């Protein structure tokens, strides 16, 4: 009887612990989103990069909008595993915002880029960023020209290019499958 009570107490403690951790992670993600949006607004207002929190190793660099999908996310600098946990991010190997070339953004298939599974050629995409060279916000509009599933070794669509392009990449298939043997690539050209 006493063993049953101890076992019941342990199960209750374990359940409360798991529930508490889930609530903590959700609250942390919500707070991070608020801080990232606040840092983006500060960056646009001041013309200087603002980290979302003091120890952040990234900062917001753009806003990505896909109107048909009701998609509106802040893009972070540097597609590292830590940065990608908080939002879509710019690959360092791609073009810089506002410069000619292939601007490459990455995001997780289970969260930030999950809506891309519904994107189709012809969809408009808008990128907004603060151009520190001219001291003002700028916008570039794109149209999706291609959606393709490729092998991870096929990096031709991520390569630097003299052609202005926007490339969005995520793992494939979408969802929470343990494997992601392919990549889902969206290519868009400026209007």
Pin down the residues of each PLM region.
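Solvent-exposed, non-transmembrane regions of membrane-associated and secreted proteins
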Residues: 2-191
């Amino acid at each position: 009887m006493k063993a049953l009570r101890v076992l019941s107490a342990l199960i209750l403690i374990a359940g409360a612990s798991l529930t508490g951790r889930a609530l903590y992670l959700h609250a942390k993600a919500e707070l991070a989103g608020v801080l990232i949006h606040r840092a983006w607004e500060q960056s646009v207002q001041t013309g200087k990069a603002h980290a979302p929190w003091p120890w952040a190793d990234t900062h917001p660099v753009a806003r990505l909008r896909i109107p048909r999908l009701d998609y509106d996310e802040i893009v972070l600098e540097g597609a590292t595993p830590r940065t990608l946990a908080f939002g879509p991010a710019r690959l360092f190997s791609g073009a810089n915002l506002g410069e000619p070339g292939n601007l490459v953004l990455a995001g997780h298939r289970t969260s930030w880029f999950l809506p891309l599974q519904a994107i189709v050629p012809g969809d408009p995409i808008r990128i907004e960023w603060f151009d520190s060279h001219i001291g003002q916000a700028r916008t570039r509009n794109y149209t999706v020209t291609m959606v393709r599933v490729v092998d991870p070794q096929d990096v031709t669509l991520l390569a630097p290019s003299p052609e202005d392009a926007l490339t969005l990449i995520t793992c494939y298939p979408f969802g929470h499958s343990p494997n992601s043997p392919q990549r889902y690539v969206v290519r868009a050209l400026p209007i």
